């Protein structure tokens, strides 16, 4: 690294630059691991609008798809690609409504279990993979197979994107092994999903975990799941800053903390103050009535701080996007 050029420039020269993010990614993100219904989510968005709290991204966690109603013969509902019509009776209409309210949509997926016979898109995917749909043989997840990846993206994800999904939250947690020694499935997911996400002509984006050096080319990064504690808040700025040593800048943390811990209004206020000045400001929590991140659930001082800072972040979007463009 002995050069007049700084080491980060040399790193990017060797490994590629961080790409330009779409403008909406710089706004506030709403995320919660909670079994929302379509009506509940709409009521939440309308409450945000009534309170003049601007959000640009609607994250819908894994319960958008069928989870508990999966026949045990197919396995668990951890992986899924079929809307739960009990919660979202009109998925296309729901996503169209969010778009009308100036929000982009990302859905959480855990791809490891492949495509099982109960999925709405199974017949189409099975036929493309040379499997008789009547056999109900699962289409195995195989990121090392180019044909599978083509079908996986074009025949499984594209139909959902045509309905309104803007990008995907790839919540991979199943290790680093594929049939090809040394080939990390998360790396393949990040690479192919990111490149494919521009197929409709939009600026590409994915939302996923870190797969090693070089992952900066596939933003945005998901650093969760964080514990609700002062120690977690203390660590996140350090984590974000030192990630620049490997060229990684676009981190999305669980602002406010995801799980465990105790309710602490001051902690929440300080965390949002940090989140607004972190790369991505995504409020997040687990499905617990005591750690939801709606500002009106906190005391008046904390509520005021959260609301002021969320509005501040939204006001910074033109500046952040302009600087991102110049840096790129």
Give the predicted meaning of each segment:
Residues 3-328:
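Catalytic-domain carbohydrate-binding cleft regions of carbohydrate-active enzymes
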């Amino acid at each position: 690294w002995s050069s007049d050029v700084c080491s980060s420039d040399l790193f990017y020269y060797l490994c590629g630059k961080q790409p330009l993010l779409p403008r909406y990614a710089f706004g506030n993100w709403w995320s919660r691991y909670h079994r929302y219904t379509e009506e509940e989510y709409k009521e939440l968005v309308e409450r945000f609008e009534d309170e003049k709290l601007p959000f640009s991204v609607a994250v819908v966690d894994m319960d958008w798809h069928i989870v508990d109603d999966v026949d045990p013969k197919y396995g668990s509902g951890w992986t899924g690609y079929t809307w739960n019509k009990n919660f979202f009776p009109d998925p296309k209409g729901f996503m169209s409504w969010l778009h009308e309210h100036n929000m982009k949509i990302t859905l959480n997926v855990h791809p490891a279990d492949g495509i099982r016979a109960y999925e709405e898109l199974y017949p189409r995917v099975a036929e493309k993979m040379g499997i008789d749909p009547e056999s109900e043989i699962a289409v195995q997840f195989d990121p090392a197979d180019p044909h599978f990846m083509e079908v996986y993206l074009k025949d499984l994800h594209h139909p959902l994107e045509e309905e309104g999904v803007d990008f995907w939250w790839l919540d991979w947690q199943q290790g680093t092994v594929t049939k090809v020694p040394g080939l990390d499935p998360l790396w393949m997911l990040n690479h192919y999903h990111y490149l494919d996400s521009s197929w409709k002509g939009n600026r590409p984006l994915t939302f996923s975990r870190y797969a090693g050096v070089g992952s900066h080319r596939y933003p945005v990064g998901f650093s969760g799941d964080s514990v609700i504690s002062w120690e977690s808040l203390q660590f996140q700025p350090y984590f974000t800053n030192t990630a620049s040593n490997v060229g990684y800048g676009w981190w999305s943390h669980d602002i406010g903390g995801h799980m465990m811990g105790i309710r602490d209004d001051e902690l929440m206020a300080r965390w949002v103050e940090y989140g607004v000045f972190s790369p991505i400001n995504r409020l997040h929590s687990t499905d617990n009535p005591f750690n939801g991140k709606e500002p009106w659930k906190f005391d008046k001082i904390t509520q005021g701080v959260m609301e002021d800072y969320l509005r501040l972040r939204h006001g910074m979007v033109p500046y952040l996007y302009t600087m991102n463009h110049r840096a790129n």
